[in-house]
């Protein structure tokens, strides 16, 4: 039966969900301890890696995974993967591109609004008993009419751009 090695420690409901999602005829092994040593040990008979967390999938791990056929990342980042070593072995890698793009874009906009509205300063002063604008000296601004430069127009960048345009900002 093909083995899917999940490279993180899941317990409780997340583990139940993962096991229910496992295709018939496969079995999922999660790491009891998410350590490099256990990953190397369990990689020996793994057919597939389901990569969560930050354990590196490097040349050493791959050397201990002779029957590895595919790597699936549960998120979008691949910084823990030695892409060059994986390519040399001809192992396909899949990611969940865009899976969290909306959430990250909303968080990005929330941080922008927090900065431009000076929410941390206003919150601190309000909790200190100072709440009148004249007493605080706090000046806030708005996004409307501002020019915002975005670096990268991938899944997240495009959503942030649409949100900023809805606020009346010019995006470059």
PLM feature segments, named:
Residues 26, 91, 169:
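Short phosphate-binding/catalytic loops that engage adenosine nucleotides
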Residues 1-46:
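N-terminal glycine-/charge-rich "phosphate-binding" loop or analogous flexible N-terminal tail
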Residues 47-127, 140-141:
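Phosphate/diphosphate ligand-binding glycine-rich loop within oxidoreductases
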Residues 5, 70-72, 92-94, 149, ...:
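Structural detector of well-ordered beta-strand residues that form the stable sheet scaffold
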Residues 19-20, 40-41, 84-85, 139-141, ...:
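Short secondary-structure boundary/capping segments
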Residues 28-34, 51-53, 128-136:
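Short gly/ser/thr-rich secondary-structure transition/capping motifs
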Residues 1, 68, 144-147:
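Phosphate-coordination loops involved in phosphoryl transfer and adenosine-cofactor binding
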């Amino acid at each position: 039966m093909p083995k899917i090695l999940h490279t993180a420690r899941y317990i409780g409901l997340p583990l139940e969900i993962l096991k229910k999602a496992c295709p018939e005829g496969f079995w999922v092994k999660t790491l009891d301890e998410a350590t490099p040593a256990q990953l190397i040990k369990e990689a020996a008979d793994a057919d597939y890696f389901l990569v969560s967390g930050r354990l590196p999938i490097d040349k050493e791990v791959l050397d201990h995974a002779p029957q590895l056929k595919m790597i699936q990342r549960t998120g979008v980042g691949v910084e823990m993967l030695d892409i060059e070593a994986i390519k040399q072995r001809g192992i396909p890698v899949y990611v969940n591109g865009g899976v969290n793009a909306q959430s990250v874009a909303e968080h990005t906009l929330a941080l922008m609004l927090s900065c431009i509205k000076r929410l941390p300063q206003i919150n601190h002063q309000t909790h200190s008993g100072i709440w009148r604008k004249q007493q605080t000296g706090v000046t806030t601004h708005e996004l409307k009419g501002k020019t915002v430069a975005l670096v990268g127009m991938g899944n997240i960048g495009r959503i942030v751009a649409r949100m900023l345009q809805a606020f009346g900002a010019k995006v470059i």
